[in-house]
A protein has these predicted regions:
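Short His-centered aromatic/hydrophobic patch
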Residues: 55-60, 80
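Donor nucleotide-sugar binding/catalytic pocket of nucleotide-sugar-dependent glycosyltransferases
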Residues: 107-141
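Short hydrophobic beta-strand element within catalytic cores of glycosyltransferases
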Residues: 241-245
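Conserved acidic donor-binding segment of nucleotide-sugar-dependent glycosyltransferases
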Residues: 256-257, 261-269, 278-284
Length: 321
């Protein structure tokens, strides 16, 4: 029986559920620079060795690589669910070379979406790469959203690659033309928005999302890049119709489900505004059909199915490294 360590930064609820299927040994490496450095220094004196280290995200690589240097037989599997490889070309030379050096120690990848898998494949086509979609952990299948409302929703943190700022600009375009839309921003994204409008509701972090799922009609996520935000699955569970870019992980699912009309060609504010109107102006029968299909899609990606798939993929990958 192989000894497996899961190193994490929290972890994300879904990633934790995945990890539980393969190990009970967990180690928190930290979610901020001071904590990561402190734990890295402490790990220098840690003599424990493991056959496999499953790493949640790129920030955990220094700790895992240090263990591999001390115990070269250790295998590292990266649960790739962040923007590390997307950000790589934009890094300064020193940082990029450091990250590339850390990445070279990885033996295999489990990406959180085909989008992330494609990015990994561009850099590491000679290493085993699999993908397993996450799932919504705050689903609301009992709710039927108000498909006729002009209330729009975005949920996310303050990472600017999510481009909630462009969504604000898009809704301003619509309201300047006489349309009466409200935009609800939930999460730390609000810290990056300095403008104020009567129609812009900066909600911040919220424990209960149901009140937004009940009265909104569209969930808009116009990211430059977002691996596979579970908020898309969660919004769809209440029947909200998503509008996303091709660079959001769920875009492959929408394309495969015949819902390519919900994918933005680009995330320019004018294009976002046009897509909101296009979907919002559809007849009730069409919106009901799409809303129900969104619920069905969301229900397919759940804890049981995805955790089992992760376990299967993990051990399949182990056989290859």
């Amino acid at each position: 029986m192989k000894s497996i360590l899961f190193t994490h930064q929290g972890p994300h609820k879904v990633h934790g559920a995945f990890a539980r299927t393969v190990t009970k040994n967990w180690y928190r490496y930290g979610d901020n620079q001071p904590e990561i450095i402190k734990n890295l220094i402490k790990s220098v004196f840690d003599r424990k060795s493991y056959d496999v280290i499953l790493v949640e995200g790129g920030l955990g690589l220094p700790h895992a690589v240090l263990k591999k240097i001390k115990h070269p037989e250790t295998k590292i599997i990266l649960l790739y669910a962040d923007t590390l490889l997307y950000d790589l070309p934009k890094m300064n030379l020193l940082k990029r070379k450091t990250v590339e050096r850390l990445l070279s120690y990885i033996d295999g990848f489990i990406a959180i979406s085909p989008l992330n898998k494609r990015i990994v494949s561009q850099h590491y086509h000679n290493k085993p790469i699999y993908h397993v979609y996450p799932y919504g952990s705050n689903n609301s299948f009992e709710i039927d959203c108000d498909l006729e409302s002009h209330d729009l929703l975005f949920i996310g943190n303050h990472e600017m690659c999510k481009r909630f700022d462009l969504l604000v600009d898009a809704v301003k375009i619509l309201n300047d033309r006489g349309y009466e839309y409200n935009l609800y921003l939930v999460g730390s994204c609000v810290s990056k928005i300095d403008v104020d409008y009567p129609w812009l509701h900066k909600e911040g972090f919220q424990e209960d999302l149901n009140k937004y799922f009940k009265h909104c009609s569209l969930y808009v996520h116009p990211a430059d890049f977002d691996s596979c935000p579970v908020t898309v699955f969660e919004a769809m569970s209440s029947g909200l119709i998503p509008i996303i870019t091709n660079n959001v992980g769920e875009s492959d699912i929408l394309n495969e489900s015949g819902l390519e009309c919900l994918i933005l060609k680009n995330n320019e504010p004018e294009m976002i505004a046009e897509k909101i109107l296009q979907i919002g102006n559809q007849n009730k029968k069409w919106k009901n059909y799409v809303s129900l299909k969104c619920k069905e899609i969301s229900s397919k990606y759940n804890n049981e199915t995805q955790s089992k798939l992760f376990k299967d993929v993990f051990y399949k990958l182990l056989d290859e490294i």
